[in-house]
Amino acid sequence: MATPVIDRAALAAIVVAAALGCRGGPPPAPHLHTVAIRAMAFEPARLEVRVGDEIEWVNDDLVPHTATAPGAFDSAIIAPAARWRTRVTRPGDVAYACTLHPMMTGTVQIR
């Protein structure tokens, strides 16, 4: 009885095709999330994002604010009608606040 023989090129093609099929596709594209600052509050106050996503704070209030999370991000002053953006790079739950108005708080859950 004859045994089938596969040449090396065909075997290599099968291995490469199998490896590519197991990748699961490219990672999802980053998303831009917007947090509005209005009436002395962050909206939404709780945001869930993925590593690599961007968050933009838009100051729709009449006074300046910040979005500050020590060790994670710091917008400095965001003037009225201005915006500030950052990309998140590490997973975790990040609490942030406005340094000018400490009662203004928010949380970013980074997955």
Locate the predicted segments by residue.
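Bacterial N-terminal signal peptides that target proteins for export
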Residues: 2-11
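Extracytoplasmic copper-binding redox domains, predominantly the cupredoxin/blue-copper superfamily
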Residues: 2-3, 17-111
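Sec-dependent N-terminal signal peptides
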Residues: 12-16
